[in-house]
C-alpha cells in the first residue's frame, strides 16, 4: 500500500517558452493547436485536425497526432515533426517547439467504477470525485443499491474498469461495511480493460480506521493507493486528494497501456490529461475571472460533459452514452424520436431519421452535407444537451445525510432526492465547447442549441470555444498559466451575446418589453410577444444599459412580473430576447410547431434562406 502524494511538476521555465504545440486526442478526431509568443503576448496561430487512430487497423494514437500536426506544418511552414516525435526545443524561427502538451479521451478515456457504503452519500461523493478527475463512471456500487453480492461480483468482472475508487464511512465510524466492499471487489478478481498482465489500480478514500483491513485484503493483488477520506465527516466533502491520485494513476497504469500512448508519453514532459479535466479547468477559469456562476458543456463524439461552478462549488458530470458520433444512436434511444423531431422544421420520417443517425454512428468522422442534414444534427445536439444537464442536476445537489439526526436504518432507507442547488436565474454564464458547437457554420446556431438545451433564465452571458481549444489550454495552464490565460481571453473565448429569458409561462398577446440605452447614447425600445424571440444588434465589446419588463408573471431575477435594470454585453450574435417562457414548450400542432421553429431561426438569422425554401416557408 502507498499513501499518495501529489506528483511534482517537471522543471519548466515559462520565460524560455515562445513556441507551444498542444494536441487533444479525441474519440473521433485528433486536434493540434499551435501557439506562439508574438511581441509580449501569447496568441493562437493555426490548427490542424485528423481522424484519431487508436482503433484497428492502426492501433497507434501517434499516427493521428502526426497527421494533425502535419496539417499545422503545411499551414505555417513551421517544422515540428521528426522520426522520434516532436522536435523540442525550438531551433531557430521555423523549426521545433519549446513545449508540447496533450490531452486525451481516445480509446474510451478513463473508465472507472466507484464504490461506497450508502448510495446517496459516500458513493455519490466518490462519483463526484471520479467525474471531477475526468473519468467516465461505468457503475456505482453501494451496500444499499439493491443488488445481491453475486450480482455485484458478476458486474465488476464484466465491466473491466481502468480503475476503482472505493470510499465509505466517516473517520472513526464502523468499518464493517467498508471491509465487506473490499472483500467483494477481491472476490470478483477484476481484470483491467487494457493490459491484462498489470495490476488494477484501486484508490481507497474511506474511513481511515478501515485502512489496515482494506490493505490486508487488497494490497497483494492490486495497485492500492490510500488517500484522505472523501467524507471524513458527513458535513464535509473532500474530493481533491482522490482526484489528484486518479490523475497520477491514469498516467502510470492506464495511458501507458493504451495503443501508442507509450510513445506519446515520451513526446511530452507534462502528464497527459483527460480531455474533460482540461475543459473543466477552463470553465473554472471563467468562473474565477468573472466571479460568476458558470455552466459549461463539452459536447463530444462519444460523451457529453457538463460542468458547473455555482457559488464556488465545482461539479462535473459525464453522460457516457450521449455523444454526436459514436454515441449518437444512444441519444435517439434516450430522448426518443419525438423529442428529436420536435426541433426539425420540415417533414421527416422516423425511419429516415434513424438511418441518418445510424450512418453517423458507423461513419463518425463524416460531416453534414446539406442544410437539412445540419438541422437534424443540431436537433440531436439539443437533446444531448438537455439530457446531459438533467443528469448533471442529479449530482449538483446538497450533500446527503447532513440535514437531520437519523439512525443508520433511516439512512439506508433514504431514497428521496433533493432538487439541485442550481437556480438558473442565478447562472451568469453559459458556455460551450466541442467540435459540433465550435464548428457550427453560424454562431447563432450554437447560441440556439445552448439556449434550447439548457433553457437559461433571467440574464445570462453566452460564450463558446472559438475552434475547440479549451482542453489544450487546460493542460497548458498547469505549467504556463500566463500563456493559457492570454490565449483564452484573446483567441478562445467567443462572446456570443446575452440571453434575456423570463422564467414562467405567459399568454398569447402578452409581451416582454426592454428599454435600452445603446452605446451611442440613443434610446431603443423593443417588444417581443410571448412565444417569440428577437435580436438586438449589440456588437462584441459593446455594453448597453437595459431595463427589462417581463410578460405578466415572468421573472427575470427580481420576482414575478417585476422590472430589472442590468448592463448587458454584446457579442457576435447580439442580445437575444427570448420570450418563449420557461419551461420552453413547443406547440402540439405539427404545422404550428414548424412555423414557430422557422420564425425563431429567422429572428436570429440562424440558417440560410435555402432552408426555408426547402421547408416551403
Model-identified regions with their sequence ranges:
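An acidic- and aromatic-residue-enriched active-site/binding cleft used to recognize and process polar
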Residues: 26, 142-143, 169, 207, ...
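Conserved nucleotide-sensing/catalytic segment adjacent to the nucleotide-binding pocket
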Residues: 368-372
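Mobile, glycine-rich extracellular loop/lid and propeptide segments
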Residues: 27-32
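Glycine-rich phosphate-binding loop of actin/hexokinase-like ATP-binding domains
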Residues: 34, 41-53, 281-354, 441-464
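Nucleotide/phosphate-binding catalytic cleft detector across ATP-hydrolyzing
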Residues: 1-22, 35-43, 49-293, 373-382, ...
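Charged, amphipathic alpha-helical linkers/stalks
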Residues: 339-360, 481-487, 498, 509
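Short, well-ordered loop/turn and helix-capping segments at boundaries between secondary-structure elements
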Residues: 312, 324, 328, 346, ...
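Basic, amphipathic N-terminal segments
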Residues: 335-339, 354-362, 366, 376, ...
Amino acid at each position: 500500500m502507498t499513501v499518495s502524494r501529489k506528483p511534482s511538476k517537471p522543471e519548466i521555465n515559462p520565460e524560455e517558452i515562445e513556441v507551444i504545440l498542444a494536441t487533444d486526442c479525441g474519440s473521433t478526431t485528433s486536434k493540434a493547436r499551435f501557439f506562439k509568443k508574438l511581441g509580449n503576448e501569447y496568441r493562437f496561430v493555426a490548427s490542424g485536425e485528423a481522424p484519431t487512430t487508436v482503433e484497428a487497423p492502426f492501433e497507434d494514437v501517434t499516427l493521428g497526432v502526426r497527421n494533425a500536426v502535419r496539417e499545422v506544418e503545411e499551414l505555417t511552414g513551421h517544422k515540428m515533426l521528426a522520426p522520434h516525435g516532436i522536435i523540442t526545443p525550438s531551433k531557430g524561427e521555423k523549426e521545433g517547439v519549446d513545449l508540447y502538451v496533450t490531452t486525451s479521451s481516445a480509446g474510451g478515456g478513463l473508465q472507472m467504477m466507484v464504490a461506497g457504503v450508502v448510495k446517496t452519500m459516500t458513493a455519490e461523493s466518490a462519483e463526484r470525485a471520479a467525474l471531477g478527475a475526468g473519468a467516465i463512471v461505468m457503475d456505482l456500487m453501494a451496500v444499499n443499491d439493491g443488488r445481491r453480492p453475486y450480482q455485484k461480483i458478476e458486474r465488476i468482472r464484466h465491466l473491466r474498469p481502468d480503475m476503482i475508487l472505493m470510499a465509505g464511512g466517516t473517520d472513526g465510524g464502523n468499518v464493517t461495511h467498508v471491509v465487506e466492499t473490499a472483500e467483494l471487489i477481491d472476490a470478483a478478481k477484476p481484470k483491467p480493460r487494457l493490459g491484462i498482465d498489470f495490476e488494477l489500480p484501486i484508490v481507497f478514500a474511506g474511513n481511515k480506521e478501515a485502512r489496515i483491513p482494506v490493505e490486508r485484503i487488497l494490497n497483494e493483488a492490486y495497485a492500492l493507493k490510500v488517500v484522505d477520506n472523501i467524507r471524513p465527516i458527513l458535513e464535509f466533502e473532500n474530493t481533491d486528494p482522490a482526484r489528484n491520485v486518479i490523475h497520477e494513476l491514469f498516467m502510470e497504469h492506464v495511458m501507458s497501456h493504451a495503443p501508442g500512448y507509450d510513445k506519446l508519453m515520451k513526446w511530452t514532459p507534462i502528464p497527459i490529461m483527460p480531455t474533460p479535466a482540461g475543459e473543466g479547468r477552463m470553465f473554472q477559469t471563467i468562473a474565477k475571472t468573472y466571479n460568476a456562476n458558470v455552466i459549461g458543456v463539452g459536447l463530444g463524439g462519444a460523451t457529453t460533459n457538463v460542468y458547473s461552478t455555482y457559488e464556488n462549488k465545482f461539479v462535473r458530470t459525464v453522460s457516457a452514452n450521449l455523444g454526436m458520433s459514436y454515441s449518437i444512436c444512444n441519444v435517439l434511444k434516450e430522448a426518443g424520436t419525438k423529442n428529436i423531431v420536435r426541433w426539425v422544421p420540415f417533414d421527416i420520417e422516423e425511419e429516415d431519421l434513424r438511418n441518418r443517425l445510424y450512418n453517423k454512428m458507423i461513419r463518425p468522422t463524416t460531416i453534414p452535407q446539406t442544410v437539412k442534414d445540419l438541422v437534424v444534427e443540431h436537433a440531436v445536439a439539443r437533446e444531448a444537451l438537455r439530457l446531459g444537464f438533467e443528469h448533471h442536476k442529479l449530482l449538483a445537489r446538497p450533500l446527503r445525510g447532513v440535514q437531520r439526526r437519523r439512525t443508520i436504518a433511516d439512512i439506508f432507507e433514504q431514497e428521496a432526492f433533493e432538487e439541485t442547488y442550481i437556480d438558473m436565474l442565478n447562472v451568469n454564464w453559459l458556455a460551450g465547447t466541442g467540435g459540433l458547437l465550435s464548428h457550427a457554420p453560424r454562431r447563432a446556431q450554437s447560441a440556439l442549441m445552448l439556449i434550447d438545451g439548457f433553457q437559461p433564465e433571467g440574464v445570462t452571458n453566452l460564450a463558446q470555444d472559438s475552434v475547440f481549444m479549451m482542453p489544450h489550454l487546460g493542460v497548458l495552464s498547469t505549467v504556463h498559466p500566463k500563456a493559457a490565460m492570454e490565449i483564452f481571453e484573446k483567441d478562445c473565448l467567443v462572446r456570443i451575446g446575452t440571453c434575456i429569458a423570463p422564467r414562467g409561462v405567459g399568454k398569447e398577446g402578452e409581451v416582454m418589453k426592454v428599454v435600452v440605452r445603446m452605446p451611442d447614447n440613443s434610446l431603443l425600445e423593443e417588444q417581443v410577444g410571448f412565444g417569440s424571440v428577437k435580436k438586438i444588434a449589440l456588437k462584441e465589446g459593446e455594453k448597453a444599459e437595459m431595463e427589462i419588463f417581463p410578460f405578466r408573471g415572468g421573472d427575470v431575477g427580481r420576482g414575478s412580473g417585476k422590472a430589472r435594470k442590468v448592463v448587458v454585453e454584446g457579442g457576435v450574435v447580439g442580445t437575444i430576447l427570448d420570450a418563449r417562457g420557461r419551461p420552453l414548450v413547443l406547440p402540439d400542432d405539427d404545422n404550428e410547431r414548424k412555423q414557430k421553429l422557422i420564425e425563431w431561426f429567422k429572428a436570429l438569422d440562424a440558417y440560410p434562406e435555402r432552408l426555408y425554401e426547402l421547408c416551403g416557408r
